[in-house]
Amino acid sequence: AKPIHAGMGRESIHVGVAGNGQAAKICNNVLTGIHIAAASESLALGQRLGLDLNVLHDIIGKGSGGSWVMERYCPKGGILENAPSSNDYKPGFTNALMAKDVGLFQQTAQTEGLPTPLASAARSMYQLAINNGLGDRDCSIIFEMIGGKND
């Protein structure tokens, strides 16, 4: 399977038996979805409080709030040149796909008897984006949806 997987991403990691790859994918994507939602809220509040978001982004990146999302996928446009937010939210990963993956995570967790309140909150945000006609836009557009402004 390695030759097939080699073209799918930068790195292929063997995770065991059939089905484990899907399990790892939804566990990873739910974290990304929650991080994007949290980063969007944090940056939107920082903006409302009058903070320079480039400075806030730098502080978060060097502090305990740093994450892949803030390093490579910042939901506020103009901070990271190659992020979807800096390119009119042209999709890297759509709201529809994020809602689907977070939903699969929730279904799987429910089957295992695991509560998922953070995943539920994040999925609600992505579903709201879909309901507002933004299903085909990048999932980081929730920054604007919750009131953040891109100048």
Regions found by a protein language model. Give the residues of each.
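Helical "substrate-binding/catalytic lid" subdomain
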Residues: N20-A121, M125-K149
